[in-house]
């Protein structure tokens, strides 16, 4: 059951990434059609922008992310239990030892960052280290190590970059349309049924693609959380430890300092406890659902 769930989560992520590229292609084609009457130009521009965004964000320094989240790097002497658990989980996962950080905050949380296992880092709040016992902490760190091993940070970063590119292209297209960039071409365009269909499709793409892209990005984030939970159990062989850790995380207070949206998706638990109108707009699946999945492994 464990390996079936891991495989299912991976398949869902592949499907969502493909959906992203479809959206990027659609928004590029729509912008190209409306502004310069060239689908090809719009698609090429969209793919170039998406690639630039992705590469620039993937190679963002780990130190920058840790600095944004007020994390400080530690040595084995400063927190030996925490350090050795990270070391043990990395060894079991067969990845290089990541850097270890602590965030001085009473809330219960942790995250991992880094574009590859070779430049990864794991951070945990001081509150988490004080409240969790060893088995629970192994579950949390196993979750973060799984994010590193599964290249989740890279996948999530690509998702954020593609969503940003889609939003940027839609915004540019809408502004240029509004200020007259495509107005004359629209007036002169073929009024055939097919032309009207293309026009409606293009306009709807500019309007709806950013919203759908955001929903797909958040869905990827949620799927990777489920996958990391299951992968943590694969590493620790202790589902109860992970379940108890999630139960404690559900009772945690929000973090004491603001956390930006990009960093928020990295954490094992929603750091600001924002109430969402729908699970479709949440970076994390409900903890109750995560526990339920673990119980049925």
Swiss-Prot record:
Coiled coil: none
The record's free-text note on cofactor binding: Binds 1 zinc ion per subunit.
Native source species: Streptococcus uberis (strain ATCC BAA-854 / 0140J)
Keywords in alphabetical order: Cell membrane, Hydrolase, Membrane, Metal-binding, Metalloprotease, Protease, Transmembrane, Transmembrane helix, Zinc
Pfam families: Peptidase_M48
Similarity section: Belongs to the peptidase M48B family.
InterPro entries reported for this sequence: HtpX_protease (IPR050083), Pept_M48_protease_HtpX (IPR022919), Peptidase_M48 (IPR001915)
Protein name (record): Protease HtpX homolog
Localization per record: Cell membrane
Gene that encodes the chain: htpX
Cofactor: Zn(2+)
Binding site for Zn(2+): 143, 147, 225
TM stretches of this protein: 14-34, 39-59, 153-173, 196-216
GO MF term (any one): zinc ion binding
